[in-house]
């Protein structure tokens, strides 16, 4: 049988063309140090800042320090199973996280992995954890209100969709309660909420999740948790992971509320990592870029222009103060980044004023534009009235001889303080907030004993629901007050049916 050379050569060519090697080319290095959530590796000469690397045990890390001889890596997982001498390879990718509607109702860690025992998650969509904030021309002014359901906030320091409003105060002053109430009030408002718990006890996070689940708020909420027992790198990236999840909804024309509880612990985790990576310390041993740590996160919250779908992401960052010191380093940084702050005061909290909002120190720099007309009319002078009441109250300690006008101001002020109190997890619809504030500012509460104000409020709401629902509907539909004569008449009718 004759051997045909051309057939053999064509077969060999085909074999060569179809040959695929079963190996991959990757730049690898060797771990020279590991501990406390960081690793150093020699040999990754072309690694880029923020690039993901993979250790030989499958754990991922992120390149942070690019030194002349080695690379400083933060370990995104269990660093205890990594040993000196292990190999580490570049992946050529940046860190991405799962995003999408499948996350709603779930509790996940900062890597997007579920920790609630409700099964695996595979959304099929990812977004980079670190993303560039929208530019000036991609945004528009804050114009829609975000109702928190808390009278003290919606009246005195209103928040708009797309705003960044800092919640600041000592530990145990009700910061988390304010945010949970704001989340509860988004039910039926076409809003998706993301609660990012940073450095909290796992038992505390579980309690918050159970509260949200019991009150049906998990139907529109995602919880991202990096608990106190987890390594610092996870606490550092948790807020960015929450922001990435929110951006997916925002860029699809939806409205998102993201709560960062709290950024003080993220700053501490970042300080720890920076010192371990041998970066030069600055004030209070924080690294020089700690301002950028928070500014690049909070700038991602925005109200997008109509061309981009008009979606929004509202941020409620928390900062924990020490003994009410709002002039501390991290506190002043975040105050300067955000569009206002709500200051919760220890003394008010312990005197029974809850939420313990200090009207004098709290401000909203852009939310006023988003406040509904009805609320603007009834709450316009409330801040000033409350501030002058606090001042007068301090003076009355020195003497009891007061003229009638001063006495009237004090009486109105005491009732204002009572009206702004609110029970936990009982957010109030905006039309009912307007109603009670109208009654207060138009003198209908002046003859009601201070101790009975909250009882008066509850009974008045029930009375209006039963007999004057049309007046409440006018506020809901038109966002403006109904005829004042009709409102006055209805409130008087209620007072005639009671002992007030």
Swiss-Prot record:
The keyword Ion transport applies. It is an enzyme of class 7 (translocase). It is a peripheral membrane protein. The record marks 362 as: Required for activity. It comes from the Bacteria. InterPro entries: ATP_synth_asu-like_sf (IPR023366), ATP_synth_asu_C (IPR000793), ATP_synth_asu_C_sf (IPR038376), ATP_synth_F1_a_nt-bd_dom (IPR033732), ATP_synth_F1_asu (IPR005294), ATPase_F1/V1/A1_a/bsu_N (IPR004100), ATPase_F1/V1/A1_a/bsu_N_sf (IPR036121), ATPase_F1/V1/A1_a/bsu_nucl-bd (IPR000194). Its EC number is 7.1.2.2. It catalyses: ATP + H2O + 4 H(+)(in) = ADP + phosphate + 5 H(+)(out). Its main location: membrane. One of its GO terms (molecular function) is proton-transporting ATP synthase activity, rotational mechanism. It is found in: Cell membrane. ATP binds at residues 169-176. Keywords: ATP synthesis, ATP-binding, Cell membrane, CF(1), Hydrogen ion transport, Ion transport, Membrane, Nucleotide-binding, Translocase, Transport. One of its GO terms (cellular component) is proton-transporting ATP synthase complex. PANTHER family: ATP SYNTHASE SUBUNIT ALPHA, MITOCHONDRIAL (PTHR48082:SF2). Produces ATP from ADP in the presence of a proton gradient across the membrane. The alpha chain is a regulatory subunit. F-type ATPases have 2 components, CF(1) - the catalytic core - and CF(0) - the membrane proton channel. CF(1) has five subunits: alpha(3), beta(3), gamma(1), delta(1), epsilon(1). CF(0) has three main subunits: a(1), b(2) and c(9-12). The alpha and beta chains form an alternating ring which encloses part of the gamma chain. CF(1) is attached to CF(0) by a central stalk formed by the gamma and epsilon chains, while a peripheral stalk is formed by the delta and b chains. Belongs to the ATPase alpha/beta chains family. This is ATP synthase subunit alpha.
């Amino acid at each position: 049988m004759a051997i045909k050379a051309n057939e053999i050569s064509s077969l060999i060519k085909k074999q060569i063309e179809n040959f695929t090697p079963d190996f991959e080319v990757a730049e690898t290095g060797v771990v020279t140090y590991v501990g406390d959530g960081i690793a150093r590796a020699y040999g990754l000469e072309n690694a880029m800042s923020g690039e993901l690397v993979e250790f030989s045990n499958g754990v991922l890390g992120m390149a942070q320090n690019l030194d002349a001889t080695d690379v400083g890596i933060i370990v995104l997982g269990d660093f205890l199973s990594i040993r000196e001498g292990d190999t580490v390879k570049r992946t050529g990718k940046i860190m991405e996280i799962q995003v999408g509607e499948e996350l709603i109702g779930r509790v996940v860690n900062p890597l997007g992995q579920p920790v609630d025992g409700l099964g695996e998650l595979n959304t099929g969509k990812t977004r980079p954890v670190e993303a560039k904030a929208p530019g000036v021309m991609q945004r528009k002014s804050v114009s829609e209100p975000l109702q928190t359901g808390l009278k003290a906030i919606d009246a005195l320091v209103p928040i708009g969709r797309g705003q960044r409003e800092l919640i600041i105060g000592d530990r145990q002053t009700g910061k988390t309660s304010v945010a949970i109430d704001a989340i509860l009030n988004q039910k039926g408002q076409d809003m998706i909420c993301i609660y990012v718990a940073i450095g909290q006890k796992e038992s505390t996070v579980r309690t918050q999740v159970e509260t949200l689940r019991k009150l049906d708020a998990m139907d529109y909420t995602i919880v991202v948790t990096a608990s106190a027992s987890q390594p610092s790198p996870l606490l550092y990236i948790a807020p960015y992971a929450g922001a990435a999840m929110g951006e997916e909804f925002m860029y699809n024309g939806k409205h998102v509320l993201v709560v960062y509880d709290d950024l003080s612990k993220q700053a501490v985790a970042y300080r720890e990592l920076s010192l371990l990576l041998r970066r030069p310390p600055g004030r209070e041993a924080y690294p020089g870029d700690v301002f950028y740590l928070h500014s690049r996160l909070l700038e991602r919250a925005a109200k997008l222009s109509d061309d981009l779908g008009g979606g929004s992401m509202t941020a409620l960052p928390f900062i924990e103060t020490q003994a009410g010191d709002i002039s501390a380093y991290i506190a002043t940084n975040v105050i300067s980044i955000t569009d206002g702050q709500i200051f919760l005061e220890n003394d008010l909290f312990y005197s029974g004023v809850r939420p313990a909002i200090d009207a004098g120190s709290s401000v909203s720099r852009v939310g006023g534009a988003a406040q509904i007309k009805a609320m603007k009319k009834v709450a316009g002078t409330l801040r000033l009235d409350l501030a002058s009441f606090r001042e007068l109250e301090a003076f009355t300690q020195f003497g009891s001889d007061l003229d009638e006008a001063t006495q009237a101001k004090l009486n109105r002020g005491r009732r204002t303080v009572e009206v702004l109190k609110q029970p936990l997890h009982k957010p109030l619809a905006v039309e009912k907030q307007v109603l009670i504030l109208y009654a207060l500012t138009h003198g209908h509460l002046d003859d009601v004993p201070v101790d009975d104000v909250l009882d008066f409020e509850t009974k008045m709401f029930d009375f209006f629901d039963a007999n004057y629902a049309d007046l409440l509907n006018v506020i809901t539909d038109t966002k403006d007050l109904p005829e004042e004569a009709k409102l006055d008449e209805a409130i008087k009718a209620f007072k005639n049916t009671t002992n007030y």
